[in-house]
């Protein structure tokens, strides 16, 4: 019997491991990647050592640290948004910020802590309490308040909390503005109520304006509350008083009652200049100004030159390709014959 043959193979060290993409991640270079993460979204941050874990937890308190694999592979899971109303609501461009020693910055710096703003924070009514107070102060931004009040009429939040916040805002605005509608935030509110253009918004406008003081009405609402003489004068004209009364044409439209605002929109205003050097009139005199727009001037009675009109239309029409049209006609006839 023959014996077996053994062969000794040369020994080799196994090839070095190739790191995966996750292993190459560096959490210290991922500030702008982690911050925008949505609620319950995972962000893989690569391997972490034990001492590094504590720093990451402190830097990102809105996230929970999760182990994803061997070698300390980890991920962050967003659980909350810790941004405050003053830091998130008084701008429409901020999604998050970094806080250190009581100061905030849009850029990360060593030792700073992330605080994120709730998505669509203005659309959910989470800013109503803060902005209602801030927009009455001395440091408010008119553009921010303008956009906030305008967006309140078009919110997509249909939750019970969102609806209640909107009702509370309307009630507070109504109480505030009924006392003095000249407050900037109230004038903005009236403007957006007018733009909303519903029966409810019109009723709220009139309710607020009718609650104003006598001094306010005398100063801002002389169109809506005219004198007896002005009312008697208006009986002489067929057109609405709002069309010729300077108190209406020069009024702040935010302080017009709905009926006056609507009448003002019906006016056809024609402006003309009249120069009079010397005019003497008595009780029997009569003066009428037409600005050169008599009935005979409005429509021309001169016959239209029809031949010239036809020539103009032919000249400016597209060039007819008669030979091309003939060829296309023959082609269509041939196709119809073949098809039959």
UniProtKB/Swiss-Prot annotation:
Q: How is it modified after translation?
A: Unglycosylated because produced in viral factories instead of the classic ER -Golgi route.
Membrane protein topology class: Single-pass type II membrane protein
For this UniProt record, the keywords arranged alphabetically read as follows: Fusion of virus membrane with host cell membrane, Fusion of virus membrane with host membrane, Late protein, Lipoprotein, Membrane, Myristate, Signal-anchor, Transmembrane, Transmembrane helix, Viral envelope protein, Viral penetration into host cytoplasm, Virion, Virus entry into host cell
Q: Which residues lie on this side of the membrane: Virion surface?
A: 2-319
Show the Pfam families listed in the entry: Pox_G9-A16
Q: Where is this region: Disordered?
A: 1-20
Q: What induces it?
A: Expressed in the late phase of the viral replicative cycle.
Question: Where in or outside the cell?
Answer: Virion membrane
Which biological process, per GO, is one annotated for this protein?
symbiont entry into host cell
Residues with lipidation of kind N-myristoyl glycine: 2
Q: Which GO terms describe its cellular component?
A: membrane; viral envelope; virion membrane
Q: Which residues form the signal peptide?
A: none
Q: What does this protein do?
A: Component of the entry fusion complex (EFC), which consists of 11 proteins. During cell infection, this complex mediates entry of the virion core into the host cytoplasm by a two-step mechanism consisting of lipid mixing of the viral and cellular membranes and subsequent pore formation.
Which family is it part of?
A: Belongs to the orthopoxvirus OPG086 family.
Listed under subunit, the entry gives: Interacts with OPG143. Component of the entry fusion complex (EFC) composed of OPG053, OPG076, OPG086, OPG094, OPG095, OPG099, OPG107, OPG143, OPG104, OPG147 and OPG155. Except for OPG095 and OPG053, each of the EFC proteins is required for assembly or stability of the complex.
| Name under which the protein is recorded | Entry-fusion complex protein OPG094
Species assigned in the record: Monkeypox virus
């Amino acid at each position: 019997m023959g014996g077996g043959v053994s062969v000794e193979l040369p020994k080799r060290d196994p090839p070095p491991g190739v790191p995966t993409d996750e292993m190459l991640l560096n959490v210290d270079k991922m500030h702008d990647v982690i911050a925008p993460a949505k609620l319950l979204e995972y962000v893989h941050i690569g391997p972490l050592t034990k001492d590094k874990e504590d720093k990451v937890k402190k830097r990102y308190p809105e996230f929970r640290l999760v182990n994803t694999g061997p070698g300390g592979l980890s991920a962050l899971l967003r659980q909350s948004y810790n941004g405050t109303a003053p830091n998130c609501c008084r701008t429409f461009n901020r999604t998050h910020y970094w806080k250190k020693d009581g100061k905030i910055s849009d850029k990360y710096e060593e030792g700073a802590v992330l605080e994120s703003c709730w998505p669509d924070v203005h659309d959910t009514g989470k800013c109503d309490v803060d902005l209602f107070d801030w927009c009455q102060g001395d440091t408010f931004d008119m553009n921010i308040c303008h956009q906030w009040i305008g967006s309140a009429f078009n919110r997509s939040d249909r939750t019970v909390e969102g609806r209640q916040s909107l009702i509370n805002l309307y009630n507070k605005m109504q109480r505030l503005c009924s006392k003095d509608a000249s407050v900037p935030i109230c004038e903005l509110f009236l403007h957006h109520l007018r733009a909303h253009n519903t029966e409810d918004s019109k009723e709220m406008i009139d309710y607020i304006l009718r609650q104003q003081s006598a001094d306010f009405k005398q100063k801002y609402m002389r169109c809506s509350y005219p004198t007896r003489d002005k009312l008697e004068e208006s009986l002489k004209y067929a057109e609405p008083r709002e069309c010729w009364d300077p108190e209406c044409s020069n009024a702040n439209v935010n302080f017009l009652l709905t009926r006056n605002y609507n009448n003002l929109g019906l006016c056809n205003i024609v402006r003309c200049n009249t120069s009079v050097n010397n005019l003497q009139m008595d009780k029997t005199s009569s003066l009428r100004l037409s600005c050169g727009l008599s009935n005979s001037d409005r429509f021309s009675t001169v016959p239209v030159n029809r031949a010239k009109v036809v020539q103009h239309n032919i000249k400016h029409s597209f060039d007819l390709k008669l030979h091309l049209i003939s060829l296309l006609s023959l082609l269509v006839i041939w196709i119809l014959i073949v098809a039959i």
